[in-house]
Amino acid sequence: MKPIEATFDEATDGSSPIMPGTYPAHVVTLVTREFDSGSTVFNMTFKIADDAKDTKIIKQHKNGSGTYEAVLDEKGQPIEMSAGYMSGKTFYANGVWLTPEPEKGQGWKNRKYLESFSNLGIDFPRNDDGVVSLAEVEEDDVLGRPAVVRLTENEYTNRNGEQRTAFKVDSILPWESGKRLSADEIADDVPF
């Protein structure tokens, strides 16, 4: 082998993995599916915003067993880095269900629907007693809306019976200072 000057150190040169955590994002798609029961599932896709550069995370690298661990400085402290590398990545959210006519005592089934879309800035009307009147959210209502999303790693079994993992949005939180993207800003991000 011919020696050269190039080196590679996984701790400093390795790629940055997707990390669980909370990130600023925007809704870029909404797909709904109605079931025979009358319930509808709302599936959103979120795109991590450029503002993620202001989010600090612990730098990770692959260890010898193929899992990730924190990169430590010379004092043994975890090294922080910007999450800017997450900007532009898209993640599916866990589906949000709307049950238009829940059985008596099962109105709780619509809590996640109300919370998720309220956290996106959707205002549902309330009567004088404070009871919320739900409405079916449409794509134009949510596209481009800002949120802080929590990414978690989920395990699943694929159709071949193999264990896999994927990152999904499991919580949608308000992003008070976030700005809604226009349809043009969302369309500019389409790669074709």
Language model region names:
Residues 1-192:
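Short beta-rich binding modules
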